[in-house]
Amino acid sequence: MNNVTGGHRGDVGIEIAPETADDPALAARIDDLLHRTCDLARALTGAEQAALKVDLDGDGRAARKFFNLSGRYDRYREYRVDPVGSGLHGMHIAAGDVIRLTQAEVEQHPAWDAFGKQAGSHPPLRGWLATPVCSEDADRRPYGLLQLSDKTDGQEFSPDDAGRLLELAAFAGATLDALRHAVARSRDARR
């Protein structure tokens, strides 16, 4: 089941498996973080598209995903599909790494599947800049993937864009850690 969340211009939020999410307040905080992170990612890099999916508990029960699209992509505002993590989106990217691909490199990449069954309805991928959002804990557990596409004016993403995205992902990971720890303390206090 997908519910649309958000309400900010450019946002498309997907709540994945909301019937199993047991903490609406946490879900609202995560939605706000996703919205702000996607919005900042676009502002910092000049991207026309940003997407971020996180799974705070690691079991898929409260997974959330946001897209933030420029006006150029208005026709994709109704696109609502649970991400399956295939193709480029399923690549393992180590904590602290960024993948930066030009459009030609996207199309030549062995993991590129042109969105499989969603090819006709998925927003196009015009270049790709992606990094994991990870916990600051020792295990650096990945919460999700922050990804951008289509730099304004047809430019390619730069090394500076990659650095800004990496810093933003680290900030988002630290914020998710704080949310996760606050929820754990709250649950422990209720017991």
Regions found by a protein language model. Give the residues of each.
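Signal-transmission linkers at sensory-effector interfaces
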Residues: 1-36, 40-43, 175-191
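A short, aliphatic-rich beta-strand micro-motif
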Residues: 126-137
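Allosteric cytosolic regulatory segments
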Residues: 162, 166-174
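GAF sensory/regulatory domain recognition
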Residues: 39-40, 51-84, 106-107
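Glycine-rich acetyl-CoA-binding "A-motif" of GNAT/NAT acetyltransferases
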Residues: 139-142
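Acidic/proline- and glycine-rich, intrinsically disordered low-complexity segments
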Residues: 73-101
